[in-house]
Amino acid sequence: AEGIENRLVAPPPELRRGCDLALEINLVEKPAVERMLGSRQVHFIDILPTRGGTELLQVVQVTDFGEAVMVKAGNMKLTFDKVSGVVLNISGGGCPDIPYLHAEMLAKPLDRAPRPREMGHTLCSLMLDRAYVQSLEIWKNGGR
């Protein structure tokens, strides 16, 4: 969002309506955000304030399994070998381009695997790209 501070997050479980993403914005900017989205014909479900204990979730989460690391972004998960950087598994989502991306990336080192955003066209591929970028950064930093 041009000129509007925002952050891509996962909506809290009680606000999810499927395979959702959310933009965290300052609620004061709600009218400007609505105008901008409307002028670009971007459809959105709602703009809601978080209520008290409702917490927006980080889109990317990392789990270290010792020899491997799993990076979860949204509903997509990418697991890679910490030493070699080889993609061990891709799972999650339900979008039609994920089986193709899985076949293209599996068993390849992260730095030689294709970027999901260059080959996919769905929300799942966007989230897989987030997981890929984070995985590459973790691997280049020695698995941390």
Predicted regions and their residues:
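Ordered, small/hydrophobic-rich secondary-structure cores
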Residues: 1-16, 82
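Structured beta-strand/loop patches that form or line metal/cofactor-binding pockets in enzymes
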Residues: 47-83
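Short amphipathic alpha-helices in soluble, non-transmembrane regions
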Residues: 2, 33-42
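Short, intrinsically disordered low-complexity segments
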Residues: 17-22
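A broad structural signal for short, well-ordered beta-strand segments within beta-sheet-rich domains
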Residues: 41-44, 87
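Active-site- and interface-proximal helix/loop "cap" or "latch" segments in soluble metabolic
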Residues: 30, 69-144
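General beta-strand structural signal in soluble alpha/beta enzymes
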Residues: 8-9, 45-47
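Helix N-cap motif at beta-to-alpha junctions
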Residues: 25-31
